[in-house]
Amino acid sequence: MGGNLKNIKRQISSTKNTQKTTKAMKLVSSSKLKKAEELARRSKVYAKQLSAVFHDVVAKIRVRGLDNINSRYFAKSEGREIKKLDIIFITADKGLCGGFNITTIKEVLRLMETYKQQGIKVRLRGIGKTGISFFAFNDIEVLDKAIGLSAAPTFEKAEAFIENVVEDFLNGATDEVIIVHNGFKNMISQELESQAILPLTINIKQNEQPSVLNIEPEDEENIILDELAKKYVQYNMYYALVDSLAAEHSARIQAMDAATNNAGDLVKSLTISLNKARQEAITTELVEINAGAEAIK
């Protein structure tokens, strides 16, 4: 009986230590989430402004009768055939964040199978140790690998990562590029995002007039459009990273909160078991004492 009591006490002590760890991890992620959420908010504002300028340049070109936009970043035709496609996936470098990583991985696997059935060759480019390790374990090739980027994204790092992807697209090595990641929705939920970032498509209403820029002459418009297109793709990559980071911390807060609560419930359950074991030990001792007393009589 004594051994059982010691075992339960050890379990209680171990569970309490785990509870302290998960609680601390929740607090750390809560602090990081505030920073990541603010970064995502500011990035979204900039992305909208960039998109507005981008639309304005395209609208100006079309208003002047230049329907043939001279930029390699745009789709040449709506019904173009896709034979080769690149998927960029973003996962965390670490686990302990619920279904955050596996949701992205499952979506990538689903897309790979879907495109395979359509006869489209798919290549992977990975950000985040968890996803990269998963595909390596399953002997699935990942072309470009970035560990540490999803945990500390900067525009410069995003720009460097997407450089090879853009070059492959412009050289015809791939026909389309998709980013798959978990996006931040709110404090308690994340939303799976699957976005095509290349080629660019832009919807301009027939009579839409440009309002932001005053660019001359026509050649300059196309030069600016090409530079804007490149920056637009780079910033989409950066925003996906920032959005994913906020979602990661949100998921980790939920996971650590659930783990902390579960540990608390387990401690309560073990404490009840400990008290029962103590009562049984006391009862056994009393029975043995009474039995001894009766034997003496």
From Swiss-Prot:
One of its GO terms (molecular function) is proton-transporting ATP synthase activity, rotational mechanism. Pfam families: ATP-synt (PF00231). It is a peripheral membrane protein. Its main location: membrane. It is found in: Cell inner membrane. Residues 10-22 have a biased composition (Polar residues). GO terms for cellular component: plasma membrane; proton-transporting ATP synthase complex. The keyword Ion transport applies. Residues 1-23 are annotated as: Disordered. GO terms for biological process: proton motive force-driven plasma membrane ATP synthesis. Keywords: ATP synthesis, Cell inner membrane, Cell membrane, CF(1), Hydrogen ion transport, Ion transport, Membrane, Transport. Coiled coil: none annotated. The keyword Cell division does not apply. Produces ATP from ADP in the presence of a proton gradient across the membrane. The gamma chain is believed to be important in regulating ATPase activity and the flow of protons through the CF(0) complex. Belongs to the ATPase gamma chain family. F-type ATPases have 2 components, CF(1) - the catalytic core - and CF(0) - the membrane proton channel. CF(1) has five subunits: alpha(3), beta(3), gamma(1), delta(1), epsilon(1). CF(0) has three main subunits: a, b and c. This is ATP synthase gamma chain.
